């Protein structure tokens, strides 16, 4: 399993190439076993977790690559404290269909395209040569040999020790059967076809109705097997403790061979693991999504924990006591983790490491930013944010500094998860793992209206009073020309419907601007209402398309165009250097009509770019 980072994961304010930390990859193992049924049990209680006290932790990093500044600079000092008060038809001509013995059909289509309009132009990225394709085949076969799928004897699994541990390990190794794909499909055969193809556009017709789309289950434990968090409430704490013990034992079996357990497949269920010593995280899902999607969600859970307990605190705690209990430090954070999990299920900005700012008039955004320009006396001020309706209005940052989208996701999630943060002035110590995982910054949070808030992030833990005085000055500027009331009026206008594009047959789309590292999408409408099976199916399809254009499942190369069609809908992803576009249309639309719809959406977003994206954010 290989994982490739997003081409650009910084905000428009500066070019950052770093994304969520990739899991170290050595040899990987894929395991499917009847005895893993314990991992699929829904019977486990919720462990409540959260912060109590944080000590000052100087940064141990000699250099911060995200901010291009020495870690010892004033802006990077990490301090902690407690809170104080168209020729479209020509594109899809001459297609050929290739069948295999699974339920999946692959339709390869030429010619390749990578231009601003889907019209079969010649401006495109060259495809791999035959030699590179052969190399990709050999690499895929090598990866296949490293994957193991096992069906063991039924019954309960006891925690292994000594010879029993070796016996379980040998059972896993030798009980290899024919490899079957996730959700009943030969996904490795399909992945090999994706790797070997010399075309840029493929049509994948898959059967996804077998997925039941049960709520995903998330677990966090220590490397000693102690429970830290589980995402659902069940009556017996013993059940979750035993479950964590089984997971810890399975992870340890492969760790003995310097290997990392990445996932287990059992029927339609997938159990994905993320190992971030001293914490282990895993998730159980039957949605049929690519493995990297679950691992990315686990990454965000890990980052949310680090926002409360920095990596330095965590390591020191477990160095002193290997079986330490995190429940005291994490007491009260369960709402933060639960809200993060809920948002990550359907919010595409998590998968793409982007933001979706408030849709508003460009002039109003510029006026707001001008009122937020800080005085020069704030030497340790890092970021200034204006938030409305849970979305960013504008962000100001120091020159040569930047902020990673995942850090902003953590901040916005923390604010959204606590009503207290939105009703009183707050001085919040928080760790931004992408900024500095070793220590804390401090955020002054004040909601000047019910749904409009100011956030000032500083490295100076003593700056509360100064920032409080400055907030009053900013508020006065925003009220002088009624900017504040106009921002409040823009909040209900932020959502828009698919009819705004004016394209018959178009049901939904997601547009990612690579330049601005932001996305836009209409609201979910029928038949994709919030929480419906149709919405879950479509989100999973988008995730598969994202996987294909980023080659995150071992493909030899990334694709530029991928089209998935089922009896319910047809979806197309179009990846270019400036943007990625995901559209959903009626399955009855012709191929030329689908291409025309993609062009229409791209043109509409270009015309609305000033309103839907935050461009040219000010610096100080």
From Swiss-Prot:
Keywords: Autophagy, Endosome, Membrane, Protein transport, Transport, Vacuole. GO terms for biological process: autophagy; protein targeting to vacuole; vesicle-mediated transport. GO terms for cellular component: fungal-type vacuole membrane; Mon1-Ccz1 complex; multivesicular body membrane. Residues 73-90 have a biased composition (Low complexity). It is found in: Endosome, Multivesicular body membrane; Prevacuolar compartment membrane; Vacuole membrane. It is a peripheral membrane protein. Residues 1-33, 41-58, 123-132 have a biased composition (Polar residues). Residues 1-165 are annotated as: Disordered. It comes from the Eukaryota. Its main location: membrane. Residues 93-102, 135-148 have a biased composition (Basic and acidic residues). In complex with CCZ1, is required for multiple vacuole delivery pathways including the cytoplasm to vacuole transport (Cvt), autophagy, pexophagy and endocytosis. The MON1-CCZ1 complex acts at the fusion of vesicles with the vacuole, through its regulation of the SNARE complex during the coordinated priming and docking stages of fusion, and particularly at the stage of tethering/docking. Belongs to the MON1/SAND family. This is Vacuolar fusion protein MON1. It comes from Cryptococcus neoformans var. neoformans serotype D (strain B-3501A) (Filobasidiella neoformans).
């Amino acid at each position: 399993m290989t994982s490739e980072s997003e081409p650009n994961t910084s905000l428009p304010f500066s070019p950052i190439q770093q994304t969520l930390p990739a899991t170290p990859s050595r040899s990987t193992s894929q395991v499917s076993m009847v005895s893993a049924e314990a991992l699929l049990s829904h019977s486990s209680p919720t462990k409540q977790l959260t912060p109590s006290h944080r000590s000052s932790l100087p940064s141990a990093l000699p250099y911060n690559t995200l901010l291009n500044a020495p870690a010892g600079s004033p802006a990077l000092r990490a301090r902690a404290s407690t809170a104080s008060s168209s020729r479209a038809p020509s594109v899809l001509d001459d297609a050929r269909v290739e069948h295999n013995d699974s339920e999946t059909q692959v339709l390869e289509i030429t010619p390749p395209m990578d231009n601003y309009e889907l019209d079969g132009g010649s401006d495109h990225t060259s495809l791999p040569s035959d030699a590179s394709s052969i190399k990709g085949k050999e690499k895929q076969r090598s990866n296949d040999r490293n994957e193991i799928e096992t069906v063991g004897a039924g019954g309960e699994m006891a925690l292994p020790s000594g010879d029993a541990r070796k016996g379980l390990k040998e059972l896993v190794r030798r009980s290899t059967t024919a490899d079957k794909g996730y959700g009943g499909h030969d996904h490795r055969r399909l992945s090999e076809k994706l790797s070997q193809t010399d075309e840029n556009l493929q049509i994948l017709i898959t059967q996804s109705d077998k997925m039941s789309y049960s709520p995903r289950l998330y677990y966090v434990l220590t490397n000693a097997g102690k429970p830290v968090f589980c995402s659902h409430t069940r009556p017996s704490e013993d059940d979750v403790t035993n479950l964590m013990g089984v997971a810890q034992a399975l992870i340890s079996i492969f760790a003995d061979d310097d290997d990392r357990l990445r996932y287990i497949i059992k029927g339609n269920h997938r159990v994905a693991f993320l190992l971030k010593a001293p914490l282990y995280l895993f998730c159980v899902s039957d949605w049929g999504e690519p493995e990297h999607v679950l691992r990315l969600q686990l990454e965000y859970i890990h980052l949310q924990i680090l926002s409360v307990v920095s990596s330095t605190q965590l390591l020191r705690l477990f160095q002193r006591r290997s079986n330490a209990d995190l429940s005291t430090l994490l007491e009260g954070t369960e709402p933060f983790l639960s809200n993060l999990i809920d948002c990550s299920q359907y919010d595409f900005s998590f998968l793409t490491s982007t933001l979706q700012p408030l849709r508003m008039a460009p002039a109003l955004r510029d006026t707001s930013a001008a009122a937020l320009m800080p005085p020069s006396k704030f030497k340790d001020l890092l970021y200034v944010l204006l938030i409305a309706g849970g979305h960013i209005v504008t962000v100001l940052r120091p020159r040569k500094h930047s902020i990673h989208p995942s850090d902003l996701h953590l901040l916005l999630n923390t604010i959204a998860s606590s009503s207290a943060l939105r009703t009183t002035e707050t001085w919040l110590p928080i760790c931004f793992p992408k900024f500095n995982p070793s220590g804390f910054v401090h955020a002054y949070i004040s909601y000047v209206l019910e749904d409009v808030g100011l956030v000032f992030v500083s490295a100076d833990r003593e700056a509360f009073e100064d920032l409080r005085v400055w907030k009053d000055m900013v508020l006065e500027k925003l009220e002088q020309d009624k900017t504040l009331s106009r921002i409040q009026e823009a909040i209900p206008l932020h959502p828009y419907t698919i009819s705004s594009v004016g394209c018959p047959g178009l049901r939904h789309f997601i547009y990612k601007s690579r330049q601005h590292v932001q996305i836009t999408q209409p609201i979910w409408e029928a038949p994709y209402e919030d929480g419906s099976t149709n919405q879950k199916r479509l989100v999973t399809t988008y995730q598969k398309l994202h996987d294909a254009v980023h080659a995150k499942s071992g493909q030899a190369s990334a694709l530029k165009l991928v089209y998935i069609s089922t009896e319910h809908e047809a979806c197309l992803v179009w990846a270019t250097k400036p943007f990625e576009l995901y559209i959903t249309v009626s399955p009855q639309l012709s191929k030329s009509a689908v291409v025309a719809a993609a062009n229409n959406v791209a043109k509409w977003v270009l015309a609305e770019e000033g309103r839907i994206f935050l461009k040219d954010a000010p610096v100080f």
